[in-house]
């Protein structure tokens, strides 16, 4: 196994990138977190932003207050408008990559709206090449807003079935948290967390405060509260090994979760 940068470089020059020894050497390389003190918050599109002023304004107030003590990367979901676009595009026979572009445009719109509400506090909206300015914005105002859709667009990996993009805004926000090495990932939804069934339609649904990815899959809950690819991403992540899902419609929940409290459902990698 390589014990130095020089040895790792030698392996990179000599071996296939899938070579087991090279893979082991790369895995043993020193780990580095870019933004270890930051938290990524994903604001749901359909669950929060689509509800309008009544849901969004209280969250804006919480975010403004929370950024005094926390560094926040605030990602936006797409929501109902994206679902409408998906239905039209799928009916036209268009592929997942095109649907991903359409969904991204809606998440962008939501980021723009949230950004305008936070503009007077100096909190910017960043995206694309602008993500390189995130550390500066966090240093100055402790928060940024970004569109949650990952930028795969036409390069979106096809779903196993159908043409709905499998990696959407939940995945995009999680991937940003993982790549930046953030300390926490919070999904802000319109439910208290994960249930044994859909609480909107089943009166027998039972709340689950904590669960692992494997337990979710075993119970058939892997495509319920989060996009199912997020669970696989969580299991393969190095830095973010658990996420919390909270009800953003309850005042104070986000603030408590940022402070490290167990507010909703915590989903663990193992």
Swiss-Prot record:
One of its GO terms (cellular component) is cytoplasm. Keywords: Cytoplasm, Metal-binding, Molybdenum, Storage protein. InterPro entries: AceGlu_kinase-like_sf, Asp/Glu/Uridylate_kinase, MoSto_subunit_alpha/beta. The keyword Signal does not apply. Coiled coil: none annotated. It is found in: Cytoplasm. Pfam families: AA_kinase (PF00696). GO terms for molecular function: molybdenum ion binding; nutrient reservoir activity. SUPFAM superfamilies: Carbamate kinase-like. The keyword Transcription regulation does not apply. It comes from the Bacteria. Signal peptide: none annotated. Optimum pH is 6.5 to 7.0. Above pH 7.1 molybdenum is released. Gene3D superfamilies: Acetylglutamate kinase-like. Octamer consisting of 4 alpha and 4 beta chains. Intracellular storage of molybdenum. Binds polyoxomolybdates. Can bind at least 90 molybdenum atoms per protein molecule. This is Molybdenum storage protein subunit beta. It comes from Azotobacter vinelandii (strain DJ / ATCC BAA-1303). The gene is mosB.
